[in-house]
A protein has these predicted regions:
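Residue(s) in the substrate-gating loop at a strand-loop-helix junction
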Residues: 131
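Conserved glycine-rich Rossmann-like NAD(P)H-binding loop of the short-chain dehydrogenase/reductase
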Residues: 29-44
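Active-site helix of classical SDR
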Residues: 111, 147, 155
Length: 237
């Protein structure tokens, strides 16, 4: 249905949360999925690889391993990310750099080794996992917001650069999603957040994964590039 059978896809941070949901959903629709992790591997995926996205050499090696063991990479999902929240007036350089290094530099490190290969083969798709915070901002997350907005800019530019080679680049931008991080938010705070969401609920990880499948597919997403798919329940349009 989605034309993903036997397509090789690399997902960064695919061992848990939204990343694991993406891995599982892509697999369900026939893709051969490799994913990176830093600590514990997840339950899904054909090829788990321990690699740190902040390290270009490790990501280059990961890409080589995927190509050797699974075949030519068709898609990359730049999902790995962290938070380190506080107000800008209290944020130290380490808090800023840690988030920039993982979320923004990590995305560059993940796609840089693959792009020339895709361009040579004249097919492929990059998907960046951004956030509603990158589209509208959020108090206490200036570092996180900056990186997630940056991913949108990367996708728009790569959409232009890759078009001549038949390589697409898009963004999935989740709103508040039922992840482990959100589950730890106090109920009173959750209630306040829910009031800002017209659909009055958080997204499920599976709903975000469906967005990735849609854009990754050469059938449903084949004429979509440089676009942002916002999955946020109407919180920001």
């Amino acid at each position: 249905m989605f034309g993903l059978k036997d397509k090789v896809v690399l997902v960064t941070g695919g061992n848990r949360g939204i990343g694991a949901a993406i891995v599982g959903k892509l697999e369900k629709h026939g893709a051969q999925v490799a994913y990176t992790y830093r600590s514990d591997p997840g339950a899904n995926g054909k090829l788990p690889i321990r690699a740190d996205v902040t390290n270009l050499a490790e990501m280059d090696a990961a890409v080589q391993q995927v190509e050797e063991e699974l075949g030519p990479i068709y898609g990359v999902v730049a999902n790995a990310g962290i938070t380190n929240d506080t107000l800008l007036s209290r944020m130290n350089p380490e808090q800023w750099e840690s988030v920039i290094s993982t979320n923004l530099n990590g995305a560059f490190n993940s796609i840089r080794p693959v792009a020339p290969l895709m361009y040579e083969r004249k097919e492929g798709c990059f998907i960046f996992i951004s956030s509603v915070v990158g589209e509208q901002g959020n108090i206490g997350q200036v570092n996180y917001s900056a990186t997630k907005a940056g991913l949108i800019g990367m996708a728009k530019t790569l959409g232009l650069e890759g078009a001549r080679y038949g390589v697409r680049a898009n963004v999935v931008s989740p709103g508040f999603t039922e992840t482990d991080m959100v589950r730890t938010i106090p109920d009173k705070v959750k209630e306040k957040i829910l009031k800002t969401i017209p659909l009055r609920r958080f997204a499920t990880e599976e709903e975000i994964a469906w967005g990735v499948v849609y854009l990754m597919s050469p059938v449903t997403g084949g004429y979509i590039t440089g676009a942002t798919l916002s999955i946020n329940g109407g919180r920001h349009t």
